[in-house]
A protein has these predicted regions:
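Short beta-rich binding modules
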Residues: 1-92
Length: 92
């Protein structure tokens, strides 16, 4: 699945391919639980426990303050994750 990866520590935003399953997302973000929040008609998938950890990196998107790494993915009418329609440049 096409996704945007936000690497909070290295302060980079890039287009990536990630398997459309939770374990792949956990591995890429570096977490055990994810939370999804709406953003620009897409979904920010981030570490649900990010604020409880000692992360020293984060970012803001719109009204959201995210601690740690995140993915931006799209969704289907059924609510499943899908390719993002945004570009990495749209996030920067």
């Amino acid at each position: 699945m096409n996704a945007i990866f936000i690497d909070a520590k290295n302060k980079t935003v890039s287009m990536i391919e990630v398997e459309n399953d939770l374990q792949s997302m956990y591995d890429k973000i570096g977490c055990l639980l994810v939370q999804t929040v709406p953003f620009a008609g897409e979904n920010i998938v981030c570490d649900e426990e990010g604020r409880l950890k000692r992360w020293t990196a984060g970012f803001e998107l719109g009204d959201w303050r995210i601690v740690g790494n995140a993915l931006i993915v799209g969704d289907t009418e059924d609510g499943d994750f899908a390719d993002t329609k945004l570009s990495a440049n749209a996030i920067m």
